[in-house]
């Protein structure tokens, strides 16, 4: 067996709880039990060492005595991570390098954040020797050139209804009611007259030109507050004839224990194909959904993606692909349609909104062109703690160089370099740890 394993740490702490009565003591013990019983390791600090933090789970207790509102016990904690941690510290890079000191007693995993100022086909971090991590690849300047894979052709925020026209049709129902904007998204002002079908407002807007290879990102909220609430938020893709050629939807119709269902489908003249139709990895996972629904078509290959976004971080993602060998679903994209809907007389989901819709044209590269993987304004995070690389909150480990590693920084002096040297500004965050 190679490598080494550091055993878990056990901590025992004697406690005294003093109350004015036995009744008050019972309530205090209830509160303490609620605090101690957690599903994950939580921060643990002691009054004589407030600048250090353990991460622990409750592991039982030995009771002492109880008399007249006084109670003693020994509480045991299990730290599967045996180290104790200092407060995080952040150090900015000076131009393209940073020198910092790890004052702990063991190595640490860094988190490096780069705010990109110019496009690049790669981004690399390392110590100038064997330690490095990288996304993308550097071009051969003698015979290669960078190019932008995506060109934005349509970007509509949910803060302005200008330019939208009333749509003609929706799936399984009728266009009724109207939209309003709350400054952050399009929401239903009304759903129209009650019927047995789906109903609700729908608007459409044309793209500047027909787009064959495209990517669309739709940012949507569908948050169910009770299991008897139903509804849907949908974005349709239309061809030049106004026909629906694809749909991105988050909906709740009561199935799978009243789960929100993410759906991305493509359509031809006589049929359709669901690339994604799921509640996620478990029922009700997306019932508080705010996130992105994405569809990309390059040639005859479709890639669909759904992810919740929580505090700027993409999580609980689901993806799927489909190749249209028969050419059934290849009409050029001409317009976008948005819709939120209510089903019959059912109680509707009150928190439903379409916040933003972005459409990109996917550019066809020449043989000697290498795509830029970051653009000005992007934020890239090399998170060596969680073994992840994020671009604007979205995991992009698919871009990671095969030889790159989530390296650690030993105790003492460390220097890191960033390439390209003019890529932007950066900072490193570490949390020193001690045995």
Where does each model-flagged region fall?
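Oligomerization/assembly interface segments of phage tail-like spikes and tubes
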Residues: 1-23, 69-82, 414
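Short, solvent-exposed beta-strand/turn "edge" segments of beta-rich domains on protein surfaces
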Residues: 2-7, 64-68, 103, 207-209
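Residue-level signal for secondary-structure boundary sites
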Residues: 21-23, 52, 64, 83-85, ...
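Short N-terminal amphipathic alpha-helices
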Residues: 25-26, 44
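Short amphipathic alpha-helices in soluble, non-transmembrane regions
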Residues: 27-36
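Short beta-strand and beta-hairpin "edge-sheet" elements
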Residues: 38-83, 87-89
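Intrinsically disordered, low-complexity segments enriched in serine, threonine, and glycine
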Residues: 89-435
């Amino acid at each position: 067996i190679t490598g080494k394993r550091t055993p878990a740490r056990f901590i025992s702490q004697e406690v005294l709880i003093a109350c004015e009565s036995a009744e008050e003591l019972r309530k205090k013990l209830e509160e303490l039990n609620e605090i101690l019983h957690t599903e994950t390791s939580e921060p643990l600090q002691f009054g004589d060492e407030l600048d250090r933090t353990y991460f622990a789970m409750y592991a039982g207790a030995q009771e002492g005595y109880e008399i007249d509102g006084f109670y003693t016990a020994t509480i045991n904690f299990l730290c599967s991570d045996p180290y104790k941690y200092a407060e995080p510290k952040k150090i900015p890079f000076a131009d393209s390098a940073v020198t910092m000191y790890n004052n702990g007693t063991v190595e640490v995993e860094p988190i490096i954040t780069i705010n990109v100022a110019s496009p690049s086909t790669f981004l690399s971090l390392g110590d100038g020797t064997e330690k490095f991590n990288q996304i993308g690849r550097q071009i051969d300047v003698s015979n290669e050139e960078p190019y932008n894979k995506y060109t934005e052709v349509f970007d509509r925020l949910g803060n302005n209804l200008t330019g939208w026209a009333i749509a003609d049709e929706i799936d399984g129902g009728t266009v009724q009611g109207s939209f309003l904007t709350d400054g952050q998204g399009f929401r239903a002002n009304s759903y129209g007259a009650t019927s047995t079908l789906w109903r609700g407002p729908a608007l459409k807007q044309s793209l500047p030109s027909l787009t064959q290879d495209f990517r669309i990102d739709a940012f949507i909220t569908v948050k169910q507050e009770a299991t008897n609430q139903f509804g849907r938020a949908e974005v349709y893709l239309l061809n030049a004839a106004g026909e629906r050629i694809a749909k991105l939807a988050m909906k709740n119709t009561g199935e799978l224990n009243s789960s929100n269902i993410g759906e991305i489908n493509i359509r031809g003249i006589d049929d359709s194909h669901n690339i994604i139709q799921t509640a996620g990895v478990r029922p009700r996972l997306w019932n508080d959904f705010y996130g992105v629904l994405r569809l990309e078509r390059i040639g005859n290959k479709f890639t669909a993606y759904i992810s919740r976004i929580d505090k700027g971080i993409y999580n609980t993602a689901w993806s799927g692909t489909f190749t249209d060998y028969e050419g059934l679903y290849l009409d050029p994209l001409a317009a976008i349609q948005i819709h939120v809907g209510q089903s019959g007389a059912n109680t509707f989901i009150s928190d439903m909104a379409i916040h933003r819709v972005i459409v990109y044209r996917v550019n066809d590269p020449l043989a000697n062109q290498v795509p830029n993987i970051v653009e000005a304004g992007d934020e890239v995070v090399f998170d060596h703690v969680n073994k992840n690389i994020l671009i604007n909150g979205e995991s992009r480990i698919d871009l990671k160089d095969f030889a790159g590693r989530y390296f650690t920084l030993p105790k003492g002096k460390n220097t890191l370099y960033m390439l390209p040297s003019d890529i932007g500004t950066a900072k490193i965050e570490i949390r020193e740890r001690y045995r």
